[in-house]
């Protein structure tokens, strides 16, 4: 959903019920959807995943094999007893920071970096269940800079992540741009955002309704006051390919990959360390539970990077639960939020020139391939967040909320008859202000938090990983000032609001 949390009201995308406004008008006939099944995407997109597996073979070090690395490791080696840095979370942010630590260190047999991932199938990982968008159309300079630098990285990805004697990396980037639509109510906010984007170097055009209609004749411009269209570095790509490219390269540089779950921290606190101030601690060990085993392996370390995606908040809650009474950790407000994605077929739809469109209502869609398929969804209304205890898909949500809005904006979508497939994934949602959290924890200074990006972590992962590595290695980052994204803002500061959260 595109919104800024100000007084509970949307700024760019006014929210209404499914019957409020023309964007929520009910259509006259029901839409058939497939029977709700937890595994829709894996059942219906099985052939695609099979092709993906073949494409990934050889993309990882031969000691593991690409596709096998995405399955449970039957004989995964335990983690080493000592590490300089333990990265908790093997998603794209975790592997990005691991890669950058070894790259910027620039010496062989240097620091020992271990990435711990509890689910090597990535069955619930935000990375691989993402729709893969990248844009610079944000309202905050930090987000614009991170996405611009990430776009540059992706354009030159083989200069960074290619492994000698391996095939070139192809993330299947589709440079079709993002198209944000604003109503009269949201026009000023969108125009102010474009001004900041241009100041930061992003190429974004403002379109009047007549210009919008001339460029995209299939759009119904009713209630659209202005639109912004990304001219460069925007579109979408394959998240699997980026994740595996980071992982493959990092492992070739000597990063250890470990399957397991970090269950607890052992830390110096005022209770067990003379001179340690109360309320502050320093992690000495992490305990890693090995797969299918009650055993836990302690790993001594100097730094912990908490990059567990939607479970980063839960990680710190559970891992610090056993610390002594002098250290009561403030809760990190990063939590999972379930989001649905639907795929439909519409041969008479917008076609190959389709951008990633964000409607005034908050509904979105983009083209999926070249055979008349599209995917899209929207965030649920406030107060109607779905249960995060499973990844079941609510098919009624598409018929009652998503489809009416998109069919109003794109009349060709009125003719679609059935959703082909659907899946659910998790946002690593920062409930405080929906922006990334990047920096050392105030109470555990050697625990570096990297998460809470609320839907834009994948696209910013190349730059965010580099910034995190530079802060850890050098204490500063010249390229992007991320001081305002530090964890300290989460307690007692004003929210750092981003107007363009989808």
Model region roles, listed by residue range:
Residues 2-85, 100-111:
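Extreme N-terminal leader/targeting segments of oxidoreductases
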Residues 102-127:
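Glycine-rich FAD pyrophosphate-binding loop
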Residues 131-215, 362-364:
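Dinucleotide-binding Rossmann-like beta1-alpha1 core, especially the glycine-rich loop
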Residues 141, 145-148, 180-189, 229-251, ...:
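Short beta-strand to alpha-helix junction loop
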Residues 209-211, 258-284:
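A conserved short coil-to-beta-strand element within the FAD-binding core of flavoproteins
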Residues 289-354, 395:
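Central helical "cap/lid" subdomain
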Residues 331-333, 346-446:
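Active-site lid/adjacent beta-loop-alpha segment flanking the redox-cofactor pocket in flavoenzymes
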Residues 404-502:
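C-terminal catalytic lobe of FAD-dependent flavoproteins
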């Amino acid at each position: 959903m595109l919104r800024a949390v100000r007084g509970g009201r949307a700024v760019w995308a006014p929210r209404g019920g499914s019957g409020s406004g023309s964007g929520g008008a009910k259509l006259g006939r029901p839409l058939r959807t497939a029977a709700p099944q937890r595994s829709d995407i894996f059942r219906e997109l099985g052939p695609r995943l099979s092709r993906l597996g073949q494409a990934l073979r050889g993309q990882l070090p031969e000691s593991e094999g690409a596709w096998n690395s995405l399955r449970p490791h039957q004989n995964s080696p335990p983690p080493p007893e000592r590490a300089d840095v333990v990265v908790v979370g093997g998603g794209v942010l975790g592997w990005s920071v691991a890669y950058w630590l070894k790259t910027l260190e620039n010496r062989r047999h240097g620091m020992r970096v271990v990435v711990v991932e509890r689910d090597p199938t990535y069955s619930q990982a935000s990375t691989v269940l993402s729709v893969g968008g990248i844009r610079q159309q944000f309202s905050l300079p930090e987000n614009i800079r991170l996405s611009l630098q990430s776009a540059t990285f992706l354009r030159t990805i083989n200069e960074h992540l290619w492994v000698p004697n391996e095939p070139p990396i192809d993330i299947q980037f589709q440079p079709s741009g993002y198209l944000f639509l604003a109503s009269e109510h949201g026009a000023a906010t969108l125009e102010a955002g474009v001004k900041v984007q241009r100041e930061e170097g992003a190429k974004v055009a403002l379109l009047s309704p007549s210009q919008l209609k001339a460029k995209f004749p299939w759009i119904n411009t009713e209630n659209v006051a202005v639109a912004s269209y990304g001219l460069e570095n925007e579109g979408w790509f394959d998240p699997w390919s980026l994740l595996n490219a980071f992982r493959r390269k990092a492992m070739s540089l000597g990063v250890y990959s470990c399957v397991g779950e970090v269950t607890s921290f052992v830390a110096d606190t005022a209770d067990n360390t003379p001179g340690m101030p109360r309320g502050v601690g320093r992690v000495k060990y992490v305990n890693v539970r090995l797969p299918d085993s009650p055993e836990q392996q302690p790993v001594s370390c100097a730094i912990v990077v908490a990059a567990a995606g939607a479970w980063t908040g839960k990680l710190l809650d559970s891992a610090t639960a056993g610390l002594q009474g002098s250290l009561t950790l403030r809760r990190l407000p990063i939590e999972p939020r379930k989001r649905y994605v639907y795929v439909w077929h519409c041969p008479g739809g917008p076609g190959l020139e389709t951008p990633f469109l964000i409607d005034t209502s908050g509904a979105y869609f983009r083209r999926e391939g070249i055979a008349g398929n599209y995917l899209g969804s929207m965030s649920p209304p406030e107060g109607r967040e779905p249960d995060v205890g499973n990844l079941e898909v609510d098919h009624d949500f598409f018929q009652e909320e998503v489809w009416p809005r998109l069919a109003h904006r794109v009349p060709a979508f009125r003719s679609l008859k059935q959703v082909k497939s659907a899946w659910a994934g998790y946002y690593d949602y920062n409930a405080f202000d929906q922006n990334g959290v990047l920096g050392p924890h105030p109470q555990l200074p050697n625990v570096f938090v990297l998460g809470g990006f609320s839907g834009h972590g994948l696209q910013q992962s190349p730059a965010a990983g580099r910034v995190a590595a530079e802060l850890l290695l050098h204490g500063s980052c010249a390229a992007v000032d991320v001081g305002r994204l530090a964890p300290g803002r989460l307690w007692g500061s004003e929210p750092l609001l981003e107007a363009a959260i989808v």
